[in-house]
Every structure is written in structure tokens, then in C-alpha cells.
């Protein structure tokens, strides 16, 4: 199962952990996924989706 936001399509990012002696080791920066229930007027029921917190903030801003 891919850690991906269903609304924005965001995925994990590759990066490096850099030590004091500048030795770089790879790491994965995961997105902050949350399970959220959203009311669908079209289907007249709650839909459970996994979305990132940036998408949740946008939904609150749009008052959805």
C-alpha cells in the first residue's frame, strides 16, 4: 500500500541525514497522512479517505 494522499497525490520524499562529520545516509520523509470522514452530498453518505494535513487545512478553509 502506497502512502499517498488521495486528493493531492502527495507521496514520500527522499532525503539525507547529515551527521556532524558530513556522512550522509538516506532517509525517507513520509507525509502526514490522516484518515478523515467527509460527507458526500452526491452519494448521501460518509466517505472515509486518507488525506494529508495540508489537504485537511484546505478543506477547512473552503468549509467543505
Swiss-Prot record:
SUPFAM superfamilies: L28p-like
Alphabetized InterPro entries for the sequence: Bacterial_rp_bL28, Ribosomal_bL28, Ribosomal_bL28/bL31-like_sf, Ribosomal_bL28_bact-type, Ribosomal_bL28_sf
GO biological process: translation
Keywords annotated in UniProt: Chloroplast, Plastid, Ribonucleoprotein, Ribosomal protein
Keyword Ribonucleoprotein: yes
Stored Pfam families: Ribosomal_L28 (PF00830)
Origin superkingdom: Eukaryota
One Gene Ontology term of the molecular function aspect: structural constituent of ribosome
Coiled coil: none
Any GO CC annotation of this UniProt entry: ribonucleoprotein complex
Annotated compartments: Plastid, Chloroplast
Keyword rRNA-binding tagged: no
PANTHER family per the UniProt record, alphabetical: 50S RIBOSOMAL PROTEIN L28, LARGE RIBOSOMAL SUBUNIT PROTEIN BL28A
NCBIfam families to which the protein is assigned, alphabetical: L28 (TIGR00009)
Family: Belongs to the bacterial ribosomal protein bL28 family.
Entry protein name: Large ribosomal subunit protein bL28c
Organism this protein belongs to: Gracilaria tenuistipitata var. liui
Gene label: rpl28
